[in-house]
Amino acid sequence: DATERQNTLLFLKEIYPTLKPFLRREGILAIENQGTSIVTDLGELETPLVNNSECAYLIFNENKTALCGIEEAYNKGIVTFNKPISCHLYPVRVKDYSEFAAVNYHRWDICSDACSLGKELKVPVYKFVKEALIRKFGEHWYSELEKVALEHLSQK
C-alpha cells in the first residue's frame, strides 16, 4: 500500500550511507545513477538493477553465494529494519486489487539455478518464502495456504 511504499522509500534513503561500504562497486554505481529505489509506471516499488540484471543491493559472501546486502546488514545489527517486503517475498509478487491480493510467482531466468535447486530439494516456492509470506499476511493466512497446497498436491 502507499504507506508501506513511502516507508520503504524513506528507509532505503536513510540506510544507504550505512550500507554503501558493504556493497559492490557496480551496485553503488547503479544506486547513485538510478536512486536508492525506483517506482515503476504502475506505482510499484523496485530496487535499482545493475545492467538490467541483478539487484544493486546484491552482495556475495566468501563462498561466492549471492546475498541481499540489506538483509545481511539487518542480520548483523547494522540496520534495524529488514529488507523491503517486496524483496523478501521475491520471486513471489503481490498485486493488490480492491477486493483481494493476487499472489503470483515471477519467473526470471536469472533465478533458474535457485529454481533448479528448489526442485531438487523438493522445496516449493511458497515454503521458500514462508517467513516473508507470514510477515506480509500473518501466521493464520500461511497455515491456510499450507492446507490448500496439501489438498492440491493430494489430488495430483
Describe the role of every protein-language-model region.
Residues D1-K156:
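Short loop/turn segments that flank or connect secondary-structure elements
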